[in-house]
Regions:
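Secreted/periplasmic carbohydrate-active enzymes, especially glycoside hydrolases
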Residues: 1-118, 122-123, 128, 132-133, ...
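Active-site metal-binding loops of divalent metal-dependent hydrolases
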Residues: 119, 140, 180-182
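Hydrophobic residues in well-ordered beta-strands that form the structural core
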Residues: 136-138
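Short, acidic/turn-prone active-site loops that include or flank metal/cofactor-
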Residues: 140-146
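Active-site cleft segment of glycoside hydrolase catalytic domains centered on the general acid/base Glu
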Residues: 146-153, 179-206
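Active-site groove signature of glycoside hydrolases
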Residues: 160-189
Length: 211
């Protein structure tokens, strides 16, 4: 079942016997997720006596040459580089309110999103991004990764794909950045096959976003 601002929007059912289930849910009204306006549908899923509540946002993202399009409209990404650092908790936020405050502060300074830099952010942070209409790029903390070595892919790929699987349903997340500042090091050339393998795996796991 789907609803928007308390009003029923549609319902559907499908036979489920375990494993992956696909369901088509027609909606009576379309309310798109936009910058500064995180329009979200409330969802209720029922299986037997079990019930789960969640939410979803509708939007599209794609590249058109050098332009980034959100819902088919060109958007300039005025984003801040957010390292998720807190003086008292280092990379752990002291409270849920602190996560939300960071977004409000960024928006008050004129930014419309963030590159989540060198850290896998808390899911609650992404929830607030969804709710507030604040776009973000997901990134993997790859410091210390030696991309001149072919076996580097075995270090980064499993954990990176876990992040993609965990977060890909967030409408606020508009792109993936699996590497930060890759280049040759210590007079050794980076292995482009490492970057290519991670890129292709990312696009296979989530073909809906730029990477």
């Amino acid at each position: 079942e789907a609803s928007y601002e308390g009003r029923p929007m549609g319902a559907a059912s499908v036979k489920a016997e375990g494993g992956l289930v696909r369901l088509h849910l027609p909606l009576q009204e379309t309310h798109l997720w936009e910058l500064g306006c995180g329009r979200l549908y409330d969802l209720k899923l029922t299986y037997g006596e079990d019930k789960v509540q969640s939410y979803a946002g509708l939007r599209s993202v794609r590249l058109d040459g050098y332009r980034f399009l959100l819902n088919g409209k060109s958007v300039f990404q005025r984003t801040v580089l957010d390292q998720g650092f807190y003086p008292d908790g280092i990379y752990t936020a002291p409270s849920d309110q602190a996560l939300e405050n960071d977004i409000h502060l960024s928006m008050a300074c004129g930014f419309n999103g963030a590159r989540l830099h060198e850290k896998i952010f808390e899911e609650r942070f992404l929830y607030h991004c969804d709710r507030l209409g604040y776009m973000v790029w997901g990134e993997f903390p790859n410091w210390g990764l030696d991309v001149t070595r072919p076996d580097a892919v075995y270090s980064v790929l499993p954990e990176w794909l876990e992040e993609v699987e965990r977060d890909f349903n967030h409408p606020a997340l508009i792109g993936w950045c699996p590497f930060n500042e890759t280049w040759d090091r210590d007079h050794r050339k980076q292995d482009d096959n490492v970057l290519r393998a991670v890129y292709l795996a990312t696009k296979s796991a989530d073909p809906t976003r730029p990477c």
